[in-house]
Amino acid sequence: MPRLQQKWLNSRECPTLRREAAKGLFPTKDDPSACTRMSPSDKDILILCCKLGIALLCLGLLGEVAVRARRALTLDSFNNSSVQDYNLNNSENSTFLLGQGPQPTSSYKPHRLCPSEIEIRMLAKNYIFTNKTNPIGRLLIMMLRNESLSFSTIFTQIQRLEMGIENRKRRSTSVEEQVQGLRASGLEVKRGKRSTLVKIGDRWWQPGTYRGPYIYRPTDAPLPYTGRYDLNFDRWVTVNGYKVLYRSLPFRERLARARPPWCVLTQEEKDDIKQQVHDYIYLGTGMNVWGKIFHYTKEGAVARQLEHISADTFGMSYNG
């Protein structure tokens, strides 16, 4: 036997089992099936699987008991404490949600404050079929799928969503108020599809989209690739008749309007870029002076007035 193997067999760290201790590990003449007895049989595997299944079943039953206990506690706490919190006696929403008819004004309180699952399903159907994108209907469906949520939580969420929908309706009707307010200040105003439009110069602008006057006439539309540069040296393009800064476009639009290599441009586009560079170099001071003079023109006065009004209305100032 080699010296290294001899040392390993004699070491105290991993002693080799000998004589009586080694019985059953290796096949011998007296016990030829010793090694096969050590591997588990099919019967052992089946017993182990049965034990695992019983353990999982017990865990599931324990979880079900815990969920039911939690649900019962939630319902008890809702019946005891939530009547005063949500003012269920006087609220029309609570009458609609709970489906119990008008509540009496006396101190009588009904026993069943939490609606049944059928009532919740009917309420969800009512919301979903009237408007499929309604957030309250989606919330009710989520409550039906995830039954661990307590009804008091759902009720507060529905109240919040109702308030949000009301605020959204109010905001959508405030365009008329904007028009009246801007007309009262002496501006030429008209109502657009989504917001007010104010006339500055010979064009209509949304409040907040105005970024200073054009270098060229507005009828002179910018070329598709190059765009134009305004008095603030910001590149802008025309989108749906509005002046939009190039940096405020979404990434795909910027990518679509990116300038191709010089060799691909037509002669007209090359001349246009050269002219803009020429204006940058030779008209820089003149453009700055024109920017200062602009505030004293009629268009500048309208723009400043609109800026103050939009700052008061929207809580922010749009610096051109």
Curated annotation (Swiss-Prot):
Predominant subcellular localization, coarse grouping: membrane
Membrane topology listed for this record: Single-pass type II membrane protein
Superkingdom, natural source: Viruses
Cytoplasmic topology ranges: 1-44
Function (record text): Superantigen.
TM region positions: 45-65
Keywords linked to the UniProt accession: Glycoprotein, Membrane, Signal-anchor, Superantigen, Transmembrane, Transmembrane helix
Family: Belongs to the mouse mammary tumor virus PR73 superantigen family.
One Pfam family linked to the record: MMTV_SAg
Parts of the chain on the Extracellular side: 66-320
Name of the protein described by the UniProt record: Protein PR73 3'-endogenous
GO terms under cellular component: membrane
Cellular compartment(s): Membrane
